[in-house]
Amino acid sequence: MNHSKRTNLPGILLLYTLAFSPNNAWGQYDRLWIPDTLSGTTFNLSIRDSSAQLRPGNLTKTAGVNGKFWGPTLILNKGDMVYMNVYNYLPDTTTLHWHGMHLPAIMDGGPHQPIPPGTLWQPYWKVTNNAATYWYHPHLHMMTVQQMTEGIGGFIIVRDSQEASLALPRTYGVDDIPLALTSRSYDASNAFAVYNNVNISQYGDYMLTNGTPNAQVSLPKQYVRLRILNAEIERGYNLGFSDNRTFYIIANDGGLLNSPVAVTRVKLMVGERIEILVNLGGDAVGSSLDLKAYNSGQPYGFPGGEPITSGLNGSLLNNIDFSVLHINIVATTSNPVTTMPATLANNTYWTAGDATVSRTVHVTGGGTDSAFSFDYTPFSMGTINKTVNLNTIEKWTIVNNNVFGHTFHIHDVQFMQFEHRI
């Protein structure tokens, strides 16, 4: 079997010093930047240092994929073989992890697949995932926080025949909008403040949506689809609209739900994705509303719910409600989606009774090198902590014994959460 390849790159020095064009006007709002798309079966991705005008004054040092912050949205089709050419022009080693994708471990892009400076990594795999919103991001051990803070990452949208058969909004950038939610803090020179001490929070003081501060977008007077990703280091979001309108969850990390779920609030934790439909058909052209984080008054342990604004675990966004996107209503498109399907998919879910193996995993304090560990065991790159047999169904009980809330994600596979107790 041919494995992913790494080759040295020719000596090229490129310095990007570009203003982040959507944010050059410092009014109340700035136009939401929507990433370009790449489609096909071969994708060329270059990771470089750059700089962007995120605040008045000095440029902020950033890093991005094929640009100055974040990266292009990759459009993949279920059943295709896809080939990635990942060029690392950074001065540091990095990785690129395909978050949520089912693929061979050697193609995963986790800490065990480093890409040294000046080299090319060429993973490939057959797309077997259902249509959904996924993403890619760096995952180098002890460098993930810094490289994600600088802006490396991007969306992946998988399409399939089931999703294509439904009358859903899918005109990218018009009625189908990707939203990466992050926050950042800055020092006096406008550099990103990155805290490498794992026992200090990574909560940012200022909201960035797709890298845009004070983001606003124009959306048509019809059903609109928002693909929302929590791309934070730590913060959670309790999302809803400023008029408390009902919206509908149609998909999550694993793909389409069986039917839309009506809500007025939804919590989104780090790395998690949802797709929602919101009906703007009854809104007047020229009116506006906000997608907001209703993060005030959250229970103890909610990431970003701490009632402190500075110091350890402090942030100006902690324990308050704030806008993540200002929405202006414009005229309908020429072919609007005006109704919502009652049925989306026919998923069959396992139950706890289907499991033949049960495990209990405790989330515990990690000591000086990490705020978290599993079962009091420090992480080791050379250690296999759990061995799972292929084609078995397991029930895992995750018990968080830590004082902080934390998300849980397994590379390569999806899992069904059937109970959650606090």
Where are these regions (language model features)?
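C-terminal substrate/ligand-recognition segments
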Residues: 359-417
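Sequence/structural signature of beta-propeller domains
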Residues: 288-305
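Long, structured stretches of catalytic cores involved in phosphate-ester chemistry, encompassing
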Residues: 270-274, 283, 296, 391-394, ...
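Histidine-centered copper-binding motifs that mark active-site loops
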Residues: 26-277, 297-299, 309-367
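Bacterial Sec-dependent N-terminal signal peptides
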Residues: 1-28
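Ordered core of a single globular domain
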Residues: 272, 277, 285-287, 400
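Short glycine/proline/serine/threonine-rich loop/turn segments at secondary-structure transition edges
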Residues: 131-135, 283-290
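Active/binding-pocket-proximal capping segment
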Residues: 243-255, 401-422
